[in-house]
Amino acid sequence: TLAGLALTASGLSSITSCTEEKKRRLVFYFTGTGNCLYVARKFAENPLSIPQIIRQDKLEFEADEIGIVYPIYGHLAPQMVQEFIRKARLKAPYLFSILTYGNRKCSATELWNNLATENGTRFDYITTLKMVDNFLPSFDMNEQVKIDKQEDKQIAEIMQDIQARKHWIQPVTEEEQQQHAEFMQRAGHTLSPSAEKLLVIKENCIGCGICVKVCPRRNYTL
């Protein structure tokens, strides 16, 4: 048709059929340093920040697809993400979660699936995504950035799974379960809510205030 020729001439060679409905996807994220925001933006144009959303009185959401992206903290979801999944009511034909980590994931997918199920949310797809580890007390960032963890390749594979609405919960091995049990015995006390108040300020602090601006829990003042 003339309309089709005009579109082709203008460079718009592919158009979406008027009868084809675009799926509405909501993606919620929690990020401390930006890793999970980067991932969330790959799956939704305007992802929703859990620290901002959780202040709402009503946490009921409905869409064609709903996803949650968060960093694994000590094999667990951050406290605020745990609070969100306990309070929120997520209604969608397809629910997915992407858990990012830098070193070991251990029982993270299993623990998250159990927590969500106990609180009335059943995820169809839960996977992990290995990225740069930015837990500064344990890792040297200069060394971490040298490691090619192929984040974008992993994201592309996850994206294919979600587009196909794959039903899959990443399995946890017995070795990973044992690693988690040993970790909790050794350092479980540092994962309590009180650990959020632990802060070390050294003489090299320049008072820029970035920590105050980016902290999702508003733990810091300057």
Feature names for model-found ranges:
Residues 172-186:
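Active-site rim beta-loop-alpha module in soluble metabolic enzymes
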Residues 121, 160-168, 210-216:
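Generic secondary-structure signature for well-ordered alpha-helical cores
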Residues 184-222:
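Ferredoxin-like iron-sulfur electron-transfer modules
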Residues 12-30, 39, 45:
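C-terminal segment of N-terminal export signals and the immediately downstream linker at the start
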Residues 1-17:
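N-terminal export signals
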Residues 51-133:
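Helix-loop-strand module that forms the ligand-binding subsite of alpha/beta enzymes
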